[in-house]
């Protein structure tokens, strides 16, 4: 039916994800078998676009099994799916209570989000873009229950949510659901009405609202924008850059190319093939001088800087304009995304630390924006005196952003305003680049000593984004909330994750070289910055700081979950544990963690893990609790 109507379908893998599938390997093996069997049967169907390998694994079970182990299990399913059907897209439908459970190898980030406030929804979408890293963001579920909120309120919410998803550059959104008739756990659910159709098949007002919805782009600031590209010996690169700029959808902009003393005929190439470009020829002067010369030649109210190895997206300017409309920011920028690698060395460089990255203080306010994707008002640029000429190859953007902040001006981040940025083509070229970055950081250290530690490392107030999805890793600190019941469970990592190796070049050679580069890169930069070479770094602690003593299970025939058992224990003097701890309750030296397993029937099983010098007391108390429940 979907094929007949020109529709694409995302399938969902049905398996026992609501159980401790790591302790019951048969459940996880059955999931692998079901995925393989399903892909063999319908994987080539023209209407199948992709597969969700899981959907909202319960947060208490994730804590019970271990967040990192669950993430790895989800990644195994995705890897299996990709190996059997590489033409399909694979993802995991996550939700805010396990925000940290993002698989590294998914093709896109998917979140089920149910928020009733437009401002809260928009704010959370901005956050999800940062969790997604370089990947597209899909809202895999959004809806509102008309039984509790009313038909008109449902229509209103679905309308603004669809517009918000468009404004904030999601790759798509799935509305839940088409009909009020739906099943869960083998039974029809009769007390929720999320559908666009009621139980008789009649259309609700929400369907009419969506049918008449005309999505529109957010209003942008008027005025001429000047795109400035500086190049030196970039003849092989700049053609693709200028072709991408020429194809941009915005019409009110000009392009200035500054040739910084090229010896390979770059300027002549630009003049011949791109006559619409304003070309400035300089003697070799350095990157900062070239950028300042471009700004002097430009006529626009806003100056947009990018590099000759970048290819701006078609909506680049269109997405930047609204950020300047309210005069909230003096400068804005967006991500610089590496294209798919063409060789194994490009794949290693793409996954290595040290690439130009934005630094964010929160979901919108930036501390640093790389010069390859930096837009600044002419007023702010002239107030700062442009770029500092002493920075000839790198570091100019860091210095410029720091001076903007020191002057009390604000920098904003726009997730949808991205440029494709080719990384260095070889490992040797990449390491030479890192040496250059280290030299630039030495200049920054001399000019901004207060922004560096005593050891010579930059003291960023915000987080440096590495391009990978924000996910649980060794040493992660997860803010579970009291007894693991926080609705939004955020994560704090010692470092934000990098991109993974591209699947096409994921080999032993690539992994070996990536490990070598990960050792060399920070040490080369540190040596060039302050002549300090660190061989070993302190390792982060594991998630489990206290080893458990034992485990057992309790039956709950009436279907009561862990909350009932925890409440009874609290009446016996047990207290909620720390909000970032993997334990629910504590009493003296005792600790307890619980999770709920549910099947298709009405009953449940409570999983209990405990720690303490005399665990029999905990066991006795829990047995008493079981009888009372």
Regions flagged by a language model, labelled:
Residues 282-298, 360, 372:
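Glycine-rich, basic loop-to-helix element that forms the pyrophosphate-binding segment
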Residues 303:
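Short aromatic/hydrophobic "clamp" motif used to bind/position activated sugar donors
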Residues 334-335, 349-367:
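Short, flexible, basic/aromatic active-site loop/helix in glycosyltransferases
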Residues 315-346:
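Conserved donor NDP-sugar-binding/catalytic core segment of glycosyltransferases
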Residues 243-252:
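Short, acidic, metal-binding catalytic loop of nucleotide-sugar glycosyltransferases
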Residues 10, 176-224:
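Aromatic-rich peripheral "rim/lid" segments of glycoside hydrolase catalytic domains that contact
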Residues 63, 69-167:
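Extracellular glycoside hydrolase catalytic/binding regions
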Residues 244, 259-268, 310:
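A conserved acidic beta->alpha catalytic loop
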